[in-house]
UniProtKB/Swiss-Prot annotation:
The gene is pdxA. This is 4-hydroxythreonine-4-phosphate dehydrogenase. Substrate binds at residues 142-143, 282, 291, 300. It comes from Trichlorobacter lovleyi (strain ATCC BAA-1151 / DSM 17278 / SZ) (Geobacter lovleyi). It is an enzyme of class 1 (oxidoreductase). Homodimer. InterPro entries: PdxA, PdxA_fam.
Length: 336
């Protein structure tokens, strides 16, 4: 018996960036069409212009609901139109208040559709935080906005590729603020949410989690900082007592040399701050990495790159990350 394909809400991202183009490219791939039923949430003019830029034979059809899009053929891109921007409003490479407000509406509606069960998951194209801020929507990024929309306090941002998966204890924080945010409770929460979120990607076995130190050489017995002894090691010990397969803390300067070996020794890595974990992740998975928000009551994946304003309108932006985010969203949806 054939398993029904999950319907995935795909938010268009910033109309002035590469989002519309990478969505067109992704939905032109038969492998993506075989994995899911797509529903794009966005703007008709922006998507139509992307079809032209990409020289795509796909047809854009406006629908009023996910149900209306469910049985459309693969030659069609179903669009739930949530903004009506004029061509003059879509200025490639230039974020604006109008585009920022439109982006917010796409994300909000996709989250609502996921929460009501009208779609199985959502995959998001890149946004401009500057544009959203201009429009009065003051969020550090997708992750924090979705956590608020889902009324979720325990969420984790994880970036992932085929070899590395890296979850963050702190996300968009100034480096000077990070040490004060490293607590036993925060590290333990991140370990728990990561283990639970990664399990479906590991055949639902207990995932192997590695935890990084904050300081050089794991603090060198307190010479370079006490966060390891005060917070990180107690969190690891508590997680182990709960039956989780957790190891560490590991010194970040050498850890990733071994972590990228295949087969990977760990299913996920918990890093203390943004650049500690994401520099090595992006060195290994710059093109194919994705973002997964763990801990939400919904499934949300995203590309692991920005709006690429310098490429907008050229039709040359890589859709590899967009394809991967849709594919993983569909895979996770199949486990629920």
């Amino acid at each position: 018996m054939n398993t029904p394909k999950p319907q995935i809400a795909i938010t268009m991202g910033d109309p002035c960036g590469v989002g519309p183009e990478i969505i067109v490219a992704a939905l032109s791939d038969p492998a993506i069409r075989s994995a899911c039923k797509p529903l794009v949430l966005g703007d008709r003019r922006a998507m139509q212009r992307a079809l032209t830029v990409c020289n795509s034979p796909l047809e854009l059809i406006t629908v009023s609901s996910p149900a209306e899009a469910a049985d459309l053929p693969d030659s069609v891109i179903p669009l739930l139109e949530l903004s009506s921007l004029a061509n003059t409003d879509i200025d490639y490479g230039k974020p604006s208040e109008l585009s920022g407000d439109a982006v917010y509406r796409y994300i909000r509606r996709a989250a609502e559709l996921c929460l009501t069960g009208e779609v199985a998951a959502m995959a998001t194209a890149p946004i401009s935080k500057e544009a959203m801020h201009r429009a009065g929507h003051h969020y550090p990024g997708h992750t924090e906005l979705l956590a608020e929309l889902c009324r979720c306090d325990e969420f984790v941002m994880m970036l992932a590729g085929d070899v590395l998966r890296v979850a963050l204890v702190t996300i968009h924080e100034a480096l000077a603020h990070v040490p004060a945010l490293i607590s036993t409770e925060q590290v333990l929460k991140t370990i728990r949410v990561t283990a639970n979120g990664v399990a479906p990607l590991c055949g639902n076995r207990s995932p192997r989690i590695a935890v990084l130190a904050l300081n050089p050489h794991c603090g060198e017995g307190g010479m370079f900082g006490s966060e390891e002894a005060d917070a990180i090691i107690p969190a690891i010990t508590a997680a182990q007592s709960e039956g989780l397969d957790v190891a560490g803390p590991f010194s970040a300067d050498t850890f990733f040399h071994f972590a990228v070996q295949e087969p990977a020794p760990y299913d996920a890595v918990v890093a203390m701050y943004h650049d500690q974990g994401l520099i090595p992740l992006k060195m290994r998975h710059f093109d194919d990495g994705i973002n997964i928000t763990l801990g939400l009551p919904i499934i949300r994946t995203s590309v692991d790159h920005g709006t690429a304003y310098n490429l907008a309108g050229t039709g040359t932006a890589s859709a590899t990350s967009m394809k991967a985010s849709i594919r993983i969203a569909a895979k996770l949806a199949a486990t629920r």
